[in-house]
């Protein structure tokens, strides 16, 4: 396999109440995962808040590191990883992603899936994902096998623990410079 391109995995900690609750259980420094097709993170996708002011309104989202939810939490900390992939894998990932984009309204946030992680039992519903499940699903459906478990059991910390990803930045999201 000749890696021609890269995708980027953004893990964040906004410091919100929900994040603090999740962190108290996971003990992991980051509890949200997103995927981007460029270093600038201008094409950033995940499952999370559809509306910055309402943590209960969740689903498939195109995120923006300068506006939206992240602008409400300027002290958000993050880690960004690079995964080298082939042109063909990127093509497959974008094809899978476009299915989500075309039908974005039908997707919901898989809140019960988070309980499944705690119980180590996958909880899967049609058209329902949580953030790391979505990112793992995009990778898996594109033929990229990182873990020996279902996407419904992948946590944001699993990305951090994998040696397949190359660390490119850790710090405040608002201070991230893709040119550095």
What do these predicted regions represent?
Residues 1-180:
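Cysteine-nucleophile amide-bond enzymes
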């Amino acid at each position: 396999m000749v890696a021609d391109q890269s995708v980027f995995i953004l893990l964040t900690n906004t410091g919100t109440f929900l994040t603090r609750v999740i962190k108290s259980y996971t003990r992991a420094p980051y509890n949200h995962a997103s995927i981007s097709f460029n270093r600038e993170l201008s094409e950033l996708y995940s499952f999370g808040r559809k509306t910055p002011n309402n943590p209960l309104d969740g689903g498939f989202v195109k995120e923006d590191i300068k506006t939206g939810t992240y602008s409400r939490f300027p002290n958000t900390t993050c880690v960004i990883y690079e995964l080298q992939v082939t042109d063909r894998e990127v093509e497959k990932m974008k094809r899978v992603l476009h299915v989500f984009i075309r039908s974005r309204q039908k997707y919901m946030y898989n809140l019960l899936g988070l309980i499944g992680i705690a119980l180590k039992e996958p909880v899967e519903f049609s058209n329902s994902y949580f953030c790391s499940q979505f990112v793992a699903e995009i990778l898996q459906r594109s033929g990229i096998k990182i873990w020996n478990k279902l996407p419904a059991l992948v946590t944001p910390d699993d990305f951090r623990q994998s040696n397949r990803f190359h660390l490119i930045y850790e710090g405040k999201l608002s201070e991230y410079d893709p040119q550095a």
